Amino acid sequence: MVTKLWKNYNAKFAYDGYFTEDNKLRKHATIISNILERYGKKKLQEIEKNCQSTISARGINFRVYAANNRAEEKKWPLDIIPRIIPRSQWNKVSKGLQQRVKALNLFIDDVYNQKKIFKDNVVPKEIIFKSPYYVKECEGFSPKYKAWSNISGVDLIRNKAGDYLVLEDNLRVPSGVSYMLENRMVMRDVFPELFTRYKVASINHYTNKLFNCMVECIPKKTKDPHMVVLTPGIYNSAYFEHSYLAEQMGIALVEGKDLFVENDVVYMKTVKGPLKVDCIYRRLDDSFLDPKTFNKESVIGVPGLFKCWRKGNVGILNAIGTGIADDKVVYSYVNKMIVYYLGEQPILNQVETYLCHEKIQRDYVIENISKLVVKPANASGGYGIMIGPKAPPKERQEVINKIKKNPREFIAQPLEILSTAPTITENDIEPRHLDLRPFVLSLIHI
């Protein structure tokens, strides 16, 4: 029976987290539906306003940069109707994420060392050496425990059948975890009944685990380790997150100008004099980290940092060179990596992907571009994506020209209808499409 609250709710166009296609409430959504029904739309809208006020008071924000490079600060949007994932589903997702990240770490270490996966013709070496994220200076080196990506953000979607699919791997500098943690705190404040009625899995331990992860990455044992979060600065879009994580872990938030290198050791400038730094959680891309080794124009990095890391005098997470696993061309081979390195079948499937540098697949993409989603292989944050069914003919032709000019830099995928969940709008509750970014911390079990 569809109640008054849900009478206008239409779940027929995608897999919905609350309702089946014939508008029957899913079992795991029964309790929350009863709570929402009892409150009614007016009360829910009041809670929503309280939620936004709390977000403003806590200073939760992010920056968006326009085409003219002007930054606009925005409040973090949070809808109070939660996405519910039953524990049985999450257990499978969790195992699949761990499996995937483990294989990716093994792959990165193999690429920079033995290169077995190339010799066995599982992954073509050309796609790695042509990746802008391949760092030749990392050749012959492994970080402690061979853990290259200590913090991984894996983007998941649910398709029309309700299956979880991996959409993207983010292994360089994955962002967004602070908003997840703050969302949970805000929801506990403004909607405590949800947490008394459901046995909600805790995420409060994340920053403790991140702290422990940093300690484990210190190359040499020390009684009193000093660790820092390295930020590009206050104008970075994720600066709120950088400061939040540093505060929660009780460690210093620093910019490149706060650090210096002497005798291949990293030091932090303090009022009491130089302080040796043992581990750095960096939130800068590789190219900006060290102007001596990489981009000479960088003014936000630390000259000499790479050499310190290679010599085992400082831990850096995520490790330099990890970006090769972010490449969307490499993404298409991850299922093969899982079989190759772990001898297991992938627990989580991924979206079918066409590689434009392979002629047969490129021809298919060009012929069917109006049906496909085309993505730059090495962009992030949704930049440069073309959704074929929605793009005008002129834009599609421009993308075709770009593919022909530089096929290695593009992949294409079928248009997946993302799952939906109820969202409070100005006048009603309506389904909205969504994805999910879980975070995986890799410790010594890698």
In which residue ranges do the predicted regions lie?
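Preference for protein termini
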Residues: 1-444
